[in-house]
Amino acid sequence: MLTRRLSCLALLMALASPAMAADAPTYGEKLEGFDYGWPVKHFTFTSQNQPLDMAYLDVKPEKPNGRTVVLMHGKNFCAGTWDGTIRALSASGYRVIAPDQIGFCKSTKPEHYQYTFQQLADNTHALLKTLGVDRVTVIGHSTGGMLATRYALMWPQQVEQLVMVNPIGLEDWKARGVPHITVDQWYQRELKVSADGVRQYEKNTYYAGEWKPEYERWVTMLAGLNNGPGKARVAWNSALLYDMIYTQPVAYEFNELKMPVLLMIGTKDNTAIGKDLAPPEIRKTLGNYAVLGKETAKRIPHATLIEFNDMGHAPQMQDPARFHEALLKGLQAR
């Protein structure tokens, strides 16, 4: 029944927005039509009594250095948005595995799924086991930083190094005063995603007020996915994921991380889930990464903090050369 309602809603939205359909490309429910520039592989498995398909990239270097890196993308990102990082790591001898998590991008978006960071971590662990990969360095960006933290806490013996790039979840938004909204309310918000809205948000948050032509590709990807034929299902899974992010903080467990941790922070980032819902006096205190990065580094036993004082939420995309130089040095210094 939900599938029928979502499909009908997607059709009505498409019919009501002919200008949008004519002006911008749209992509399928599993991001069909958008090319990552790398061969996409698929891991099929059963979870929560249903068959699922996890898309992933597995890029092997020409001159291996013996290390494997797992890249965990953020909420508004995909495996493909790691393109520059994949190239930098591969050129330095790292094997790179970059999944699209369930609910995202080129992977299955279930009608019903109990999303937890533990479940997503377990899905990723199953993928690595199938690939015969044991010891890994895990790099997580944004929401992927929360997932990478959970993964490292669940399998500390497997994670030789953890890297977090502007992770969200450095503060507990509920405890800070961000009000809860229901999944249905998140869903209604996600149905309104547009290219203009994505572009403005990314400019202000990801790139610290800057804009370059190469950023437009990722606006097209996200807006095209959210306004394609799978619009309703994409929005529904996005709503479920936002509820997961809001209700499952990892900030209280950073002190339990046993491995070396590299924390890479663009200090002009201002990301905070649901910040616009908070009262003005609270809103202005949220997402202060110039403070959050330093506070978090103090809570992690073996942390190294690298700050980029002129960058926002996505330093690996804002200034790839400078970011990757710092990343590669940090990986070697573990």
Please place each PLM-identified region on the residue numbering:
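Conserved HGGG/HGGXW glycine-rich cap/lid loop of the alpha/beta-hydrolase fold
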Residues: 48, 52, 57-106, 326
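Flexible "cap/lid" loop of the alpha/beta hydrolase fold
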Residues: 149, 153, 162-193
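Conserved serine/cysteine hydrolase catalytic core
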Residues: 227-298
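Catalytic active-site module of serine/aspartate enzymes centered on a nucleophile-bearing elbow/loop
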Residues: 290-334
